[in-house]
């Protein structure tokens, strides 16, 4: 172990989280806590009645790429128009999903500062308004269920063929559980599909190594239903369909855009087992253990199946080797994002609203014991014709794109 990864590995809680990777639980071969988390029905049941009853979005309400955020707005845990402040995002995601406060503050602040007004942002929207226009700096290719921007001309369309790929991995409704083991397999399939079908596929330092992994891990970690029998959570077919706005029988599934719903009698993860940044890091490492390529930045070069890796040392001007980035992907991704901010925004790290994001990112890297990246070499990304910092929610379909 080198000095770069020693600080985080020395953390007792992080060590305990890593131990779960070698354990199996009743639901199957998936990484789960060594000791089942507590279950408290009264505190974990999420209210979906009264003020929090499902209300379909109206014509002026924003609904975008993230099914969880759409569901929060549909149940009025976020403002129903889909535009919320940093504090509102933090409150809703921690209260309803059991997201760790550190992760919630990180994601909410980044979204508001880079893709919003500085203090608020939209769960849809275009560039500098919300997540819909964040392709290249936040939203990314190889989503679990949503379309690659340059493959389909949209980054917010749910592709039913992709949903079927995941849904059909658990054929028996009585025992179905879309846990992390299932999602790891699906993650690998989707990564390869973007290589095979999206000529402008980009897997970036922050958008790929961190954000795109979250799109998969969050499905199980935040959508599973918890119980006394299964305190770790089970994500069955009906709950998955509800959160993804899918209805109908298995031979005729239908997607209704923006109608994501929290199911009745749904119990979130216990906040004593909050999904923190170190917790998320161990899930990334579980994913990459089966596919080391997920640890490497890369892209297609304008045609399908032309994927090339880009060396972490080149991108970080020697601050991280490829092995160091792979050992601690959150450190590399966050430090890269931090070093990239001046070029991304045209502002200094201490100026105005950017100072608040700098403070949040610096807190993350300090707690993880990360080595700083003094400057980034974004010219290395010139290899990637699909690379941009602000794109979406629509774009021309790339020549040669293959649609499922």
Spans of features found by a protein language model:
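Polar/charged low-complexity regulatory segments
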Residues: 1-63, 67-68, 78-404
